[in-house]
């Protein structure tokens, strides 16, 4: 855990980290010396020359004050390091997420990333003062006390030194017991978080299916798993605590027995033995403190583990190339491209090659799961091919830096996401520097102006989280306006009309067709009515382009596209007749 935390310390604070470690060690030495000085103090106080106790009292006072000062300075530096780690870590996590490969964002990893950002503040800031310092004391203070006892009684010093690995081993074993169960509990808590969020978001579907009781849903299973994991955690903590308790009692018996034997034989005086009892308590105190901090230590370990999992998540390696400025409409080319997701059963695309001419509109059609959306993702640079190249005007997309990849493409997703804010904010997110006239043109083309006209607050209407205040068709229109506002030479549309009614579908199709900006357009469609303006059609099946041509050419050929077209037209003519 400490190694993980040290790795998170910014480079410009490493010198302060070294200073913190040195001061913490000096503080431990001061406290150990102050503890052991009780022995000569008591011996002098009850000896033949009590006035000599003033000397030892002075040394004890000096050691105590030095310990206070060192602790105060160490705590201040520790808090500074905590805030530095917090700021550095949150920025690192935020910077890492945009370049992490999209297939990493499973439900579990998404919850991990959310917890890594949201739950790190108090733990990281207080980690040094509340956990690192006590943990360091538990390891160093008993050992330093044992070394300081050697000049007083080598027998006691050896016994105390022997007790250090015994007690640390018991602490380690106790933590190992708890850690195994805590890992399962942490996974169960993460799964429960995701299931509760899912349960809240899908209430409409659950109520329609009469499955609103948590016990009958995945939430019920997650709650049961979390309960089992919690009980296991408690069950594993108890044996660990008993083990440490036994080790502490054994260490106390050995030290007390050694002190008693040395006192009986006359090696130690009674006042020295009494003082050594206090030293024994101080010797065992750090171990007890750390055992009480075990839950907090495991919680912090889990937090650092979540941060580490995000910071080590696989990333897309972007190039360093830039995209030329200007309004040049590019050519898009796939050169023997293959792609597969990690852990997938096989390639999603295999041997895909085609060339899309500048300024044309190409429709990609095919059955569900054939790889249509993956082609768009590769053009946009959201994924990188496992084989082959994706070229834009002869430039490999993989060689472009992230900013260039973002500048080339404007994307309309099948399930658009609107940020919590106004309609204006969401449209301007594509190009914050756009003018009001450009904004007005984009919302008019996407027919968002009709929506704005009937809303009391117009373009300043709050859309809610993920656009929840708008209907599905309205959200899609806003996303179309956002895509049209961006001055990108490539426009990618991923099944933008698949879940829309006829009116909204017509509005979206007309908006894309009326866009006056010269672009190379690629439209993925499942409903063929939305591709009537396409210059070219690629029919994809099982990860390969099986047909390529214009709509009329493919219909005349009588192949897969023709069959697809005929099936949809027949479905559109279905009617329910009343008898």
Curated annotation (Swiss-Prot):
One of its GO terms (biological process) is iron acquisition from host. GO terms for molecular function: ABC-type transporter activity; ATP binding; ATP hydrolysis activity; ATPase-coupled transmembrane transporter activity; siderophore-iron transmembrane transporter activity. Pfam families: ABC_tran (PF00005). Its EC number is 7.2.2.-. Residues 1-16, 74-115, 180-237, 282-579 are cytoplasmic. Residues 332-567 form the ABC transporter domain. Gene3D superfamilies: ABC transporter type 1, transmembrane domain (1.20.1560.10), P-loop containing nucleotide triphosphate hydrolases (3.40.50.300). It is a multi-pass membrane protein. Residues 38-52, 137-158, 259-260 are periplasmic. Keywords: ATP-binding, Cell inner membrane, Cell membrane, Membrane, Nucleotide-binding, Translocase, Transmembrane, Transmembrane helix, Transport. The keyword Mitochondrion does not apply. Coiled coil: none annotated. It is found in: Cell inner membrane. Induction: Repressed by iron and IdeR. GO terms for cellular component: cytosol; plasma membrane. ATP binds at residues 366-373. The chain crosses the membrane at residues 17-37, 53-73, 116-136, 159-179, 238-258, 261-281. It comes from the Bacteria. SMART domains: AAA. Disruption phenotype: Mutants show normal growth in iron-sufficient conditions, but show a growth defect under iron-deficient conditions. Residues 17-299 form the ABC transmembrane type-1 domain. Belongs to the ABC transporter superfamily. Siderophore-Fe(3+) uptake transporter (SIUT) (TC 3.A.1.21) family. In IrtB the ATP-binding domain (NBD) and the transmembrane domain (TMD) are fused. Part of the ABC transporter complex IrtAB involved in the import of iron-bound mycobactin (Fe-MBT) and carboxymycobactin (Fe-cMBT). Transmembrane domains (TMD) form a pore in the membrane and the ATP-binding domain (NBD) is responsible for energy generation. Required for replication in human macrophages and in mouse lungs. Forms a heterodimer with IrtA. This is Mycobactin import ATP-binding/permease protein IrtB. It comes from Mycobacterium tuberculosis (strain ATCC 25618 / H37Rv). The lineage of its organism: Bacteria, Bacillati, Actinomycetota, Actinomycetes, Mycobacteriales.
